[in-house]
């Protein structure tokens, strides 16, 4: 359901109002966006108070990428009312950035002060393993685009909040941190591009997250970013890359990553 001519903030408020009506909850204080391979983790987050297609909300578009169910769930985790967005849309699907970040803006309008962004990522370090979770410490926005229009000079010094990363690390001390590089996609990177990204300081590479982070920070929310390493990037293993292995890695890790995510959120 799209309303392309409305002010983005007004559209987010309308969608948030519908969420309140559909769930019976006026304020969700945490929101989670589940990326490629993460949707299987929904069951481990807890029982849902309400489940419905995101596309039934004003301004939302059904995701087309495999592994993105396009559902919205309302879940209670500890003391928190949590909005779970199972799947996202991507710029490479042909969508304008205002549509890509609309779910995050809606979550903020629905009361979320913490946004948890998850994704599937290629690991750029040889010591990384498929199935490993990595906390995003910072990002490189190599898409060259921003979801903000106008004089919105948002500070991104602490884009991925140190406080939340510490809470996550306290929950699971084995978690490591890394810099996430966002590429436009949908093609995977070449080995030469991977070598370049490593020289730039990147540890992870993917095709999402950074625009949502910018939108969330502009709305005053804190962000925790978590990448699931679903493959080692081009040129590291010598094997070709494909999306099926991304989904397989997520499915294999579903219960573990879902339970860990719930434990982290309970500490917020």
UniProtKB/Swiss-Prot annotation:
It is an enzyme of class 2 (transferase). One of its GO terms (biological process) is nucleoside metabolic process. Pathway: Purine metabolism; purine nucleoside salvage. One of its GO terms (molecular function) is purine-nucleoside phosphorylase activity. Phosphate binds at residues 36, 68, 88-90, 120, 208. It catalyses: a purine 2'-deoxy-D-ribonucleoside + phosphate = a purine nucleobase + 2-deoxy-alpha-D-ribose 1-phosphate. NCBIfam families: PNPH-PUNA-XAPA, PRK08202.1, PUNP. Homotrimer. The purine nucleoside phosphorylases catalyze the phosphorolytic breakdown of the N-glycosidic bond in the beta-(deoxy)ribonucleoside molecules, with the formation of the corresponding free purine bases and pentose-1-phosphate. Cleaves guanosine, inosine, 2'-deoxyguanosine and 2'-deoxyinosine. This is Purine nucleoside phosphorylase. The lineage of its organism: Bacteria, Bacillati, Actinomycetota, Actinomycetes, Mycobacteriales. The gene is punA.
């Amino acid at each position: 359901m799209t309303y392309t001519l409305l002010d983005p903030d007004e559209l987010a408020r309308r969608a948030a109002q519908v969420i309140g009506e559909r769930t019976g909850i006026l304020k969700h204080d945490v929101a989670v966006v589940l990326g490629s391979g993460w949707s299987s983790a929904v069951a481990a987050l807890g029982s849902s108070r309400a489940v419905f297609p995101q596309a039934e909300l004003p301004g939302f578009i059904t995701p087309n990428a495999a592994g993105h169910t396009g559902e919205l769930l309302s879940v209670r985790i500890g003391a928190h009312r949590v909005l779970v967005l199972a799947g996202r849309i991507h710029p490479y699907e042909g969508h304008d950035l205002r549509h890509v970040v609309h779910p995050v803006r809606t979550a903020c309008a629905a009361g979320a002060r913490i946004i948890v962004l998850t994704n599937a990522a290629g690991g750029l370090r040889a010591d990384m393993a498929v199935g490993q979770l990595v906390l995003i410490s910072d990002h490189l926005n190599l898409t060259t685009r921003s979801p903000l229009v106008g004089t919105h000079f948002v500070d991104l010094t602490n884009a991925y909040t140190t406080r939340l990363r510490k809470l996550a690390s306290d929950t699971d001390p084995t978690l490591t941190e890394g810099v996430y590089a966002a590429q436009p996609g949908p093609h995977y990177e070449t080995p030469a591009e991977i070598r370049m990204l490593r020289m730039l300081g990147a540890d992870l590479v993917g095709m999402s997250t950074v625009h949502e982070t910018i939108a969330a920070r502009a709305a005053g929310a804190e962000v925790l970013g978590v990448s699931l390493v679903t493959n080692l990037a081009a040129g590291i293993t010598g094997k070709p890359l494909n999306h099926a292995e991304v989904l397989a890695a997520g499915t294999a890790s579903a219960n573990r990553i879902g339970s860990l995510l719930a434990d982290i959120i309970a500490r917020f």
